[in-house]
């Protein structure tokens, strides 16, 4: 029997599901329990296809627009995703007489309120974020047309020419890189000293915590694996943070079978984290894949302990989930385990 080479896996903590993702998944599960299938969900509830597929198997139907819901099903509930929606979406739901449950992350809702507060004070709103991301679309959709400008890069900040430089306020997308946002803000605040900040930090605690844990683990890592979907903003930012913080290479993966072990080169230290919408079962799957090839020692790279929770909608608080539902909500679904074994 061949002797396996030693390998240290630095496991970041915190990682994976945040309180907003937990809440959003729970809302869909509770709605299915209370109202029965189908429950419609506008956009992916969170950006992870395994979560989406698991909810589909339980009776959720995902649509991008409300007019995709058949008329014969418009008595069924519809859930708005964790990323938030423009004001026009609940207005359209009311026009269709739809019963809707808002799963917008409370921290995203807070950004919406901060943006509207700026507008009430007659400030033009600068939104730092990524064009096309559902959260950005939702935040911009809270404001009057022409009342918000999207700034994506330092170059955008350098060339921005507002009509009234003395009446500006900013908010940010919650899932941005802390460093990138700081660079953009530095430019904006130097150019526009009167720029009004939000009353509270826009980048969410989970984004900051996961980035800090990645920074702590990156130096000396031959490889840094981030579990997450390509359309997950916070997961892509973790890859960038790992690269900037000293990892020799950093890769975004959705499953263990995406890792090309034959081309990784010599490894002695691999660091591992997961975006806020990535289930823990995929982290377990990746560790198992490495154990088949290496003599693995796990080191925990923990920077903070998270204990945040968010309440679900009042209509759902009397519903009890099964142990299987709880396992799915916590990212440890037996259904996913079975898929892993079939790989």
Curated annotation (Swiss-Prot):
Database matches in Pfam families: LYTB
Chain residues that bind isopentenyl diphosphate: 47, 83, 133, 232-234, 277
Positions with a binding annotation for dimethylallyl diphosphate: 47, 83, 133, 232-234, 277
Active site: 135 (proton donor)
Disulfide-bond pairs as recorded: none
GO biological process: dimethylallyl diphosphate biosynthetic process; isopentenyl diphosphate biosynthetic process, methylerythritol 4-phosphate pathway; terpenoid biosynthetic process
Keyword hit for Cytoplasm: no
Gene Ontology MF terms: 4 iron, 4 sulfur cluster binding; 4-hydroxy-3-methylbut-2-enyl diphosphate reductase activity; metal ion binding
Cofactor(s) needed by this chain: [4Fe-4S] cluster
Annotated positions binding (2E)-4-hydroxy-3-methylbut-2-enyl diphosphate: 47, 83, 133, 174, 232-234, 277
Catalyses which reaction(s): isopentenyl diphosphate + 2 oxidized [2Fe-2S]-[ferredoxin] + H2O = (2E)-4-hydroxy-3-methylbut-2-enyl diphosphate + 2 reduced [2Fe-2S]-[ferredoxin] + 2 H(+); dimethylallyl diphosphate + 2 oxidized [2Fe-2S]-[ferredoxin] + H2O = (2E)-4-hydroxy-3-methylbut-2-enyl diphosphate + 2 reduced [2Fe-2S]-[ferredoxin] + 2 H(+)
Pathways per UniProt: Isoprenoid biosynthesis; dimethylallyl diphosphate biosynthesis; dimethylallyl diphosphate from (2E)-4-hydroxy-3-methylbutenyl diphosphate: step 1/1; Isoprenoid biosynthesis; isopentenyl diphosphate biosynthesis via DXP pathway; isopentenyl diphosphate from 1-deoxy-D-xylulose 5-phosphate: step 6/6
Keywords: 4Fe-4S, Iron, Iron-sulfur, Isoprene biosynthesis, Metal-binding, Oxidoreductase
EC primary class: oxidoreductase
EC number: 1.17.7.4
InterPro entries reported in the protein's UniProt record: LytB/IspH (IPR003451)
Cofactor note: Binds 1 [4Fe-4S] cluster per subunit.
Residue sites binding [4Fe-4S] cluster per the record: 18, 105, 204
HAMAP family associated with the record: IspH (MF_00191)
Family: Belongs to the IspH family.
Function: Catalyzes the conversion of 1-hydroxy-2-methyl-2-(E)-butenyl 4-diphosphate (HMBPP) into a mixture of isopentenyl diphosphate (IPP) and dimethylallyl diphosphate (DMAPP). Acts in the terminal step of the DOXP/MEP pathway for isoprenoid precursor biosynthesis.
Designated name of the protein: 4-hydroxy-3-methylbut-2-enyl diphosphate reductase
Species for this entry: Bartonella henselae (strain ATCC 49882 / DSM 28221 / CCUG 30454 / Houston 1) (Rochalimaea henselae)
């Amino acid at each position: 029997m061949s002797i396996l080479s030693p390998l240290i896996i630095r496991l970041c903590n915190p990682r994976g599901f945040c309180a907003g993702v937990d809440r959003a998944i729970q809302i869909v599960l509770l709605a299915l329990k209370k109202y029965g299938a189908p429950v419609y969900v506008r956009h992916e509830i969170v950006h992870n296809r395994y979560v989406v597929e698991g909810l589909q198997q339980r009776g959720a139907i995902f649509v991008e627009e409300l007019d995709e819901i058949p008329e014969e099903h418009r008595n069924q509930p519809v859930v708005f995703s964790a990323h938030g929606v423009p004001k026009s979406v609940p207005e359209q739901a009311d026009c269709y007489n739809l019963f809707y449950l808002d799963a917008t992350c409370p921290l995203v809702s807070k950004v919406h309120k901060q943006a509207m507060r700026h507008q009430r004070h007659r400030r033009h709103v600068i939104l730092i974020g990524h064009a096309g991301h559902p959260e950005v679309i939702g935040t911009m959709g809270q404001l009057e047309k022409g009342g918000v400008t999207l700034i994506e890069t330092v170059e955008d900040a350098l060339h921005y020419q507002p009509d009234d430089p003395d009446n500006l306020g900013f908010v940010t997308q919650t899932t941005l890189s802390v460093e990138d946002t700081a660079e953009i803000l530095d430019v904006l605040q130097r150019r526009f000293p009167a720029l009004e900040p939000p009353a509270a930090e826009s980048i969410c605690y989970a984004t900051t915590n996961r980035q800090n844990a990645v920074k702590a683990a990156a130096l000396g890592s031959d490889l840094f694996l981030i579990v997450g979907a390509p359309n997950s903003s916070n997961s892509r930012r973790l890859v960038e943070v790992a690269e900037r913080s000293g990892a020799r290479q950093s890769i975004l993966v959705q499953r263990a079978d995406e890792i090309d072990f034959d081309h990784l080169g010599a490894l002695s230290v691999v660091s591992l984290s997961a975006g806020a919408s990535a289930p823990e079962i995929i982290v377990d799957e990746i560790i198992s894949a490495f154990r088949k090839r290496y003599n693995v020692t796990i080191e925990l790279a923990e920077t903070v302990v998270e204990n945040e929770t968010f309440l679900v909608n009042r209509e759902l608080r009397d519903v009890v989930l099964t142990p299987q539902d709880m396992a799915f909500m916590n990212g440890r679904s037996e259904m996913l385990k079975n898929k892993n074994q079939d790989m």
